[in-house]
Amino acid sequence: MSKLRMVPHGNSGSADFRRCFALLCPSAVAVVSILSTCLMTNSLGRADKEMRLTDGEDNCSGRVEVKVQEEWGTVCNNGWGMDEVSVICRQLGCPTAIKAAGWANSRAGSGRIWMDHVSCRGNESALWDCKHDGWGKHNCSHQQDAGVTCSDGSSLEMRLMNGGNQCSGRIEVKFQGQWGTVCDDNFNIDHASVVCKQLECGSAVSFSGSANFGEGSGPIWFDDLVCSGNESALWNCKHEGWGKHNCDHAEDVGVICLDGADLSLRLVDGVTECSGRLEVKFQGEWGTVCDDGWDSNDAAVVCKQLGCPTAVTAIGRVNASEGSGHIWLDNLSCQGDESALWQCRHHEWGKHYCNHNEDAGVTCSDGSDLELRLVGGGSRCAGTVEVEIQKLLGKVCDRGWGLKEADVVCKQLGCGSALKTSYQRYSKVKATNTWLFLSRCSGNETSLWDCKNWQWGGLSCDHYEEAKVTCSAHREPRLVGGDIPCSGRVEVKHGDTWGTVCDSDFSLEAASVLCRELQCGTVISILGGAHFGEGNGQIWAEEFQCEGQESHLSLCSVASRPDGTCSHSRDVGVVCSRYTEIRLVNGQSPCEGRVELKILGNWGSLCNSHWDIEDAHVFCQQLKCGVALSIPGGAHFGKGSGQIWRHMFHCTGTEQHMGDCPVTALGATLCSAGQVASVICSGNQSQTLSPCNSTSLDPTRSTTSEESAVACIASGQLRLVNGGGRCAGRIEVYHEGSWGTICDDSWDLSDAHVVCRQLGCGVAINATGSAHFGEGTGPIWLDEVNCNGKESHIWQCRSHGWGQHNCRHKEDAGVICSEFMSLRLIDETSRDICAGRLEVFYNGAWGSVGKSNMSATTVEVVCRQLGCADKGSINPASSDKPMSRHMWVDNVQCPKGPDTLWQCPSSPWKQRVASSSEETWITCANKIRLQEGTSNCSGRVELWHGGSWGTVCDDSWDLEDAQVVCRQLGCGPALEALKEAAFGQGTGPIWLNDVKCKGNESSLWDCPARPWGHSDCGHKEDAAVRCSEIAMAQRSSNPRGHSSLVALGIFGVILLAFLIALLLWTQRRRQQQRLTVSLRGENSVHQIQYREMNSSLKADDLDVLTSSEYPNESDDFNDAGLISVSKSLPISG
């Protein structure tokens, strides 16, 4: 079968190629043209351009010529002015611009005209940096060639006349052999500075216009000068041109330079040599300075000029005697770095709008003799405001004193915010203080000295009252060691020290104030006898005398403890009302029904999964409904609607309120609407539970069912201490008024099971001995305990009897129960205990926590509970390597309020295998600070850990360690690693010792060191750093490489434009071929062949034709531009 060839009609392919660019769209041509121009412009680098002046009288005058691409050409004078001339003169090393000359001033040039409509600002470094129409673009002839006249300044002179010396007087300039003056239009201190510097007369003191030094004669050479103050000569300033002005000699300007002025400065009527009213000697006479615009920058210049220490305050309207005579200066405006007051901007000498009651003054100090403190208030954060400046004590006058000023004082002293301010009246007889007067603070200042216009040294306070302040940190309270939110041992912070409070010193009113301050509602109970464990450290020797309505404990008055002494065994504890809004609904009386609680503002039913008779007893007691008679199962009083709380209470039955009971919510089982707690109380408000006898406590003889209870309760109490939670620790029993321990003789899991069950802590997973949780104190109540494991209370087990033993406290027994929960952040690649995978210890094993619904609030609870920080962030897993681990719980959702993760609702406990992508990874904000330094980037290193600030020991402390600290604080590179308490000794724990950083760690937490809190140092070895305070940012630049990339990019765009044009031409040609084959009547064979080819394609032919709609680069083009089809196709005929 013969091959079919399709021959396109029309001209040959070569002819079509000749018409290719005629078919290109105009926009493609424009793109190529623009890019070609860009390439040309880009190729004109700065290095291949030169400039010269020709046909002039010397090297600094003549016609301007520019060399571009090895060809010299001229510049057109369209728009030519002094700004352009200034650039050329400076570029050619002839710094003084004299004249902008056109073609008439120099012979016309020849060749190219390279630049036209040049427009300079005057500060460019080269003429081609100015705007212009483009290289070689112009609309002028060589008759408009631009020229300039410059000068190297050697023929120019300047002098000061009629001032009495060579450094003061009327300014005169010699130009072209003739002396002339300068007009005072827009003349200022910057111009005067250039003149004085040029004449080597020191700095400029003042300037004056209006021919103050007499009228000159001859030309007026300059008008409307524009100087920056940095010029080397007056004629290098911008100007309209030599001899161009609109002035007469009545406007001649003059200057007084420092070397020609009789100027002096002094402070008078102050309490020290470096304080008082400011006076200036000018032209032989002393005068004052007006306080308009007077501020700390102005005062700083005065103090520096007088050789006094740093300025403390800029005083206006001083209480000392007023000055007299001239008021020399007004509206001073200093930057603060001037060496003399008269270098600052100001009105002309002697021009002012003031009286002497506005005379300015200063107080200078280097800060070492400047102190602020609160005295007589019981702590460093309360009392009368006392200031000490240069060894002189003073008080703050109540005039202008308010809560904003008090807030600044509290902030400066590190005492939080101001709670109240008050005054203390003194009689005139005692009014001998040196007073500090304030003219209002904004409240945003970090120091009282930052408040504007405070005055020091007055001996009269109108009302004879001194200011007093109470700051929030005066007595900052917290509750420690409680198993529930808003409960625990009372600890109060005075300054930087936490201490406990004796149970005899804390009244119900004081407890009410504490609960209110901590936003914990109302007080439920006050518990003495170290109910929440003994504290350590300070015991405050003061009795709180609150009225009960105060908002903060700091607002209560205090008195010395009446009995004088106290020990930690009497530390007071408080339980506040987190769970006191309770009720019974759907019962036939107020004392029976479905149990409901109000939590976070919402009422809901309580799940009955952990509801027992002990919980019910406390519930009835709180409602004043007697004791619990039964706890009916099912939805005995209706299913209820709305929220079902899954909180699990762990009451012993002896508590007075539900808030006294430990509570958990994490991992609680799900509840349906029918699984709600109910109770039937006795209704007798006076009825209480009586002690049980031995028979009633014997579980083998008890007839008590799950729904009814005997109306008695065991007299003993049981607790676990030092275990980190309510379900682990040393066992302690309360008997005959004292807490005591249990000896570990014969102690085993059967005994431990009873303890765990009694406390509602599940089952025992470990029975510990040998004082595993530390040695206790007091009696050892039980020894040789032998339980069968079924007893409900530990004292039902056989033993030697109460108080009968042969042990010491080093044998105290302990237990870890299955319900014991602990928390940690762990990352196997880091030692940082405040960042890593979130894990909980439950039922004797560690497991991770899922990240589903994990919120910022939940992260905050975790970080606070671990004592790491107040907030943190959720991060991806630290390793990309997929791993599988056991997960305990998921969907933890903490609302606002809980203090521990245990009080947060979640999905039920369920151990399962989970991938690392399902786990929660948290980084708590590692808190680090520098204290007592001269700036935020120097000082003693302090770390926040375990809920308190502590220091770092200087053992092994070096520059690599300091480098990490400075980087972590954003303070740039470290300058010094300081030892031996270089910035003073800290307080509190010494958290780290033997730190050994490499220097590239991102946090001090990442560096090797001893375990946290393990140190053999004292605070005299506290480590410190001094950082550079410069945040380094590395940048790299490669102009040559950048230019190469630009050129390559432009070439690529041009190539792309060409390919687009070729594609358009190819498509157009193909369309013409098809029209020719199908429509030409004189060649009908072509029509038949074309139709037959399309109608007889078989399925196997599609493989050849569906790969591309059009021929591509692999198609076989012959010399004539024909396309060969190698597949034989049948033709039906």
From Swiss-Prot:
Entry-listed glycosylation sites: N59, N139, N331
Protein's UniProt name: Scavenger receptor cysteine-rich type 1 protein M130
Modifications made to the protein after synthesis: A soluble form (sCD163) is produced by proteolytic shedding which can be induced by lipopolysaccharide, phorbol ester and Fc region of immunoglobulin gamma. This cleavage is dependent on protein kinase C and tyrosine kinases and can be blocked by protease inhibitors. The shedding is inhibited by the tissue inhibitor of metalloproteinase TIMP3, and thus probably induced by membrane-bound metalloproteinases ADAMs.
Assembly and binders: Interacts with CSNK2B.
Extracellular compartment spans: 48-1044
Gene Ontology terms: biological process: acute-phase response
InterPro entries per the UniProt record, alphabetical: SRCR (IPR001190), SRCR-like_dom_sf (IPR036772)
Lineage: Eukaryota, Metazoa, Chordata, Craniata, Vertebrata
Residues in SRCR domain copies: 51-151, 158-258, 265-365, 372-472, 477-577, 582-682, 718-818, 823-925, 928-1028
Domain comment, as recorded: The SRCR domain 3 mediates calcium-sensitive interaction with hemoglobin/haptoglobin complexes.
Record gene name: CD163
One Pfam short name: SRCR
Keywords: Acute phase, Cell membrane, Disulfide bond, Glycoprotein, Inflammatory response, Membrane, Phosphoprotein, Repeat, Secreted, Signal, Transmembrane, Transmembrane helix
Sequence motif Internalization signal, residues: 1090-1093
Annotated function: Involved in clearance and endocytosis of hemoglobin/haptoglobin complexes by macrophages and may thereby protect tissues from free hemoglobin-mediated oxidative damage. May play a role in the uptake and recycling of iron, via endocytosis of hemoglobin/haptoglobin and subsequent breakdown of heme. Binds hemoglobin/haptoglobin complexes in a calcium-dependent and pH-dependent manner. Induces a cascade of intracellular signals that involves tyrosine kinase-dependent calcium mobilization, inositol triphosphate production and secretion of IL6 and CSF1. After shedding, the soluble form (sCD163) may play an anti-inflammatory role.
Membrane topology (UniProt): Single-pass type I membrane protein
Organism: Canis lupus familiaris
Localization: Cell membrane
GO CC entries: external side of plasma membrane; extracellular region
Transmembrane segments: 1045-1065
Principal location listed in the UniProt entry: membrane
Domain of life according to the entry: Eukaryota
Signal peptide coordinates: 1-47
Cysteines engaged in disulfide bonds, as pairs: C76-C140, C89-C150, C120-C130, C183-C247, C196-C257, C227-C237, C290-C354, C303-C364, C334-C344, C397-C461, C410-C471, C441-C451, C502-C566, C515-C576, C546-C556, C607-C671, C620-C681, C651-C661, C743-C807, C756-C817, C787-C797, C863-C924, C894-C904, C953-C1017, C966-C1027, C997-C1007
